[in-house]
Amino acid sequence: MEPPGDWGPPPWRSTPKTDVLRLVLYLTFLGAPCYAPALPSCKEDEYPVGSECCPKCSPGYRVKEACGELTGTVCEPCPPGTYIAHLNGLSKCLQCQMCDPAMGLRASRNCSRTENAVCGCSPGHFCIVQDGDHCAACRAYATSSPGQRVQKGGTESQDTLCQNCPPGTFSPNGTLEECQHQTKCSWLVTKAGAGTSSSHWVWWFLSGSLVIVIVCSTVGLIICVKRRKPRGDVVKVIVSVQRKRQEAEGEATVIEALQAPPDVTTVAVEETIPSFTGRSPNH
């Protein structure tokens, strides 16, 4: 008896297939080690170019043209705004660090061909983002509020430290290092309330008003005196002129009297001689 024509080989019998062969080949090539061309071993002051070693450029210079069999490396200086700090085989120089004033930064060391710029904080700012040896961002110092004192001033790395004034003291604008003691003024006015650390007693207002009144009164008095003073001066001048005129007239009268010829009446004097002739002394 012959088996039916549609019967095939048993299912457990394996037949080679093309996909299996492809998988084996793929795994074989995948596991094979890959070999890359080895780079030449160059000295510390050289850099590899293909299979050759070329001399490096000095700090502040970049490679313009690599070396050849008969020529050395051609180097040229870094352009402004760029730098290279070490021996190198770079074809481009590095860009200098920019210190942005909008971030509160300033250059504490300017950039050169051999050194990068170092940024620090502008006056009144402290660093909030440190990046290596330079600062990347700064912030303005905090301002103490009225009623606070400056406990510790800000530095380039630390903000200003503020502290509230203790009871019985005050700070009007927050810029003082030590709070001021509140003044007792019971002789002038009763205290309206407990003094706060940022405001003083009410007597400041009253005493200030009193001072203003006194100053205004003094100024008004001075103005009145100055306005009246010219009239008094005029009277004094008139009196002085009259007095001088009278003195002058008196002196003129005296001079005229002295210079006028004397009013003398000449009287003839007759000399008489007593006659004793014919008379005796007894008569």
Curated annotation (Swiss-Prot):
Query: Which GO molecular function terms does the record list?
Result: cytokine binding; receptor ligand activity; tumor necrosis factor receptor activity; ubiquitin protein ligase binding; virus receptor activity
Q: Where are the TNFR-Cys repeats?
A: 42-75, 78-119, 121-162
Tell me which CDD domains the record gives. TNFRSF14 (cd10582)
Question: According to the UniProt topology, which residue ranges lie Cytoplasmic?
Answer: 224-283
Cystine links in this protein are 42-53, 54-67, 57-75, 78-93, 96-111, 99-119, 121-138, 127-135
The glycosylation sites are: 110, 173
Q: Which family does it belong to?
A: Belongs to the tumor necrosis factor receptor superfamily.
Give the protein's recorded name. Tumor necrosis factor receptor superfamily member 14
Q: What is the lineage of its organism?
A: Eukaryota, Metazoa, Chordata, Craniata, Vertebrata
The gene behind this protein is TNFRSF14
